[in-house]
Amino acid sequence: MQIFVNGEKLQTEATFLNLLLVELGYEGNWLATAVNAEVVPLEARDQFILHEGDKVEILSPMQGG
């Protein structure tokens, strides 16, 4: 299916958000995720079903100063 990840088109076979993160090489519990502008908490990622055309945002913390 085709989805968008951080604004870029992506073809994926992942059906759940947690599987997409694995496919893209994201590891750890420090990520923030949203699908179609709705935050998806860590504990819900393995149950969150992706659909054609979804807009996924994956955010990682940044150090600032």
What are these regions (language model features)?
Residues M1-G64:
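Ubiquitin-like/PB1-type beta-grasp interaction modules and other compact soluble beta-rich domains
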